[in-house]
Amino acid sequence: MLKNDRLLRALNRQPVDRTPVWLMRQAGRYLPEYRATRARAGSFLSMAKNPDIACEVTLQPLQRFPLDAAILFSDILTIPDAMGLELYFVEGEGPKFRHPVRDAAAIHRLGVPDMETELRYVMDAVRVIRRELDGSVPLIGFSGSPWTLACYMIEGGGSKEYARIKAMAFNAPEVLHHLLGTVTDAVIAYLAAQRAAGAQALQVFDTWGGVLSPAMYHEFSLPYLTRIAHELERGEGAERTPLVLFGKGNGAYVADLAASGAEAVGVDWTISLADAAQRAGGRVALQGNLDPATLYGSPEAIRTEVGKTLDSYAQGNGGSREGHVLNLGHGMSPDMNPEHVGVLVEAVQRLSKR
């Protein structure tokens, strides 16, 4: 039995006593205890692939702040790593793959990894974290979106231009659709396995959906997100595991995402919550959408922005604050002040009381 089920209730658009709050990358380098754990573990991957260390890091922000959820400490690129692309990290450059897939032959060789063998470390981490949380708050599991994972798999790492994957979209769309189909199968299996291991809410990160034109988004990202929402078994009624579809730069597609079958849509700060709520039309909960840079502001500025965000959602939702989870519009940065996170969380709790 959960002691704090605000997140799950809000994602399912049920009444809550205040707006729940959690933060993307709430377990991260801005915390000195995280940096100490990373120094001890030796690398990011060493932490992510050790269930006990992943649990330790997941719980660190909850030991500091009264957040309404824990999110699994992992990476969106675990699926392609398990497919054989071999993930590694370069300091200052981010994630890379030793074996990117750039032609039809390489793409057709890919298969869906076995979740309890190649990705057992993720499921073990979920199980350990659930045990340690002991019902205090829900645990969120997650995956990258098919389009975002395909970007990394084809580019071989992060990119500014996405030239290789966009060239494939124009020159060999059937090959790209084959890749996206295989990755979607894997994402559905991955999220289902996390749910079976104990994840109580699930989020898909479509980090790079916003680099697509509207026509390409509707061809190469949205259909696969919709397939996940339709095919991922999440239970029924009050016990249903809510699914959040988050995307950077997805404001123009809120109405499409609200029709996808997911329980919630996560938006960034490039659309007002009032506008997003009007587009959603009460079909889904909304999550967001403070600009992470707000945390560089003074405590008073942070409180002001929290108030504006809460009010903006209510303005677009017929005056009601139900069906909203307050979050950032993207992840936290390493140079942010932990004390400012405390200010943000306290402001949400105080200003959103029903």
From Swiss-Prot:
Its main location: cytoplasm. Substrate binds at R25, Q26, A27, G28, R29, D75, Y152, T207, H330. Homodimer. Signal peptide: none annotated. This is Uroporphyrinogen decarboxylase. It catalyses: uroporphyrinogen III + 4 H(+) = coproporphyrinogen III + 4 CO2. The keyword Ribosomal protein does not apply. Catalyzes the decarboxylation of four acetate groups of uroporphyrinogen-III to yield coproporphyrinogen-III. GO terms for molecular function: uroporphyrinogen decarboxylase activity. Belongs to the uroporphyrinogen decarboxylase family. The record marks D75 as: Transition state stabilizer. Pfam families: URO-D. Pathway: Porphyrin-containing compound metabolism; protoporphyrin-IX biosynthesis; coproporphyrinogen-III from 5-aminolevulinate: step 4/4. The gene is hemE. GO terms for cellular component: cytosol. It comes from the Bacteria. InterPro entries: UROD/MetE-like_sf, Uroporphyrinogen_deCO2ase_HemE, Uroporphyrinogen_deCOase. Its EC number is 4.1.1.37. It is found in: Cytoplasm. The keyword Lipoprotein does not apply. One of its GO terms (biological process) is protoporphyrinogen IX biosynthetic process from glutamate. HAMAP family: URO_D (MF_00218). Keywords: Cytoplasm, Decarboxylase, Lyase, Porphyrin biosynthesis.
